[in-house]
């Protein structure tokens, strides 16, 4: 079992090394997109399904509350399937449409959708990305290597951060790294003296 733990660490580290050379520019560009959105008086809208929902929730928590710095809250919304709202949407909508009502009620030009699709096949997320593109809402999507369906729906102004991995657990932990890097860069850039 000890060797298996070491193998998991090694696998994770190798993906981090590959990602650092492949994704640094995309993370920088994503930071710029988030700051442009927030400085324009707009909001970040985040979504994910299954285990990536937790990453979307973590991003919104960091934006609303704080990352490292005590600072004003950044406007952000989590598209949610929880509570009575989620229950009524699940009951009355086709599965791929579950986020559309929430998105339509809150999204406006200048907002930014950050979507998590580690497998690249999550129909709910693919649908909301298409919806955002049609409404001309900018999109950042975090994926893994199996991302052909997503590449076909993004607009030129949108951004994909594709983790060089196919194993969902490694993709999710690297999405978490991207969230942390993004939040740290936004905080340090907008509040450099704090």
UniProtKB/Swiss-Prot annotation:
Cellular component aspect of the GO annotation: DnaA-DiaA complex
Database matches in InterPro entries: GmhA/DiaA, SIS_dom, SIS_dom_sf, SIS_GmhA/DiaA_subfam
Residues covered by the SIS domain: 34-192
An individual GO BP term: carbohydrate derivative metabolic process
Domain of life: Bacteria
Gene Ontology molecular functions: carbohydrate derivative binding
Protein family (similarity comment): Belongs to the SIS family. DiaA subfamily.
Name listed for the protein in its UniProt record: Uncharacterized protein HI_1657
């Amino acid at each position: 079992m000890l060797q298996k733990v070491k193998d998991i660490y090694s696998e994770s580290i190798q993906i981090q090394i590959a990602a650092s050379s492949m994704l640094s520019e995309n993370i920088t560009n994503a930071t710029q997109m988030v700051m442009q959105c927030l400085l324009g008086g707009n909001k970040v809208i985040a979504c994910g399904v299954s285990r990536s929902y937790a990453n979307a929730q973590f991003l919104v928590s960091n934006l609303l509350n704080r990352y490292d710095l005590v600072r004003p809250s950044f406007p952000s919304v989590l598209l949610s399937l929880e509570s009575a709202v989620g229950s009524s949407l699940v009951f009355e909508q086709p599965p791929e449409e579950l986020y559309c009502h929430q998105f339509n009620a809150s999204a406006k030009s200048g907002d930014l959708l950050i979507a998590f699709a580690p497998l690249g096949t999550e129909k709910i997320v693919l649908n909301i990305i298409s919806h955002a593109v049609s409404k001309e809402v900018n999109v950042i999507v975090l994926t893994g290597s199996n991302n052909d369906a997503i590449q076909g729906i993004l607009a030129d102004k949108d951004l994909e951060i594709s983790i060089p991995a196919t194993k969902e657990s490694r993709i999710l932990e690297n999405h978490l790294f991207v969230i942390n890097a993004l939040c740290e860069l936004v905080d340090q850039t907008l509040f450099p003296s704090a």
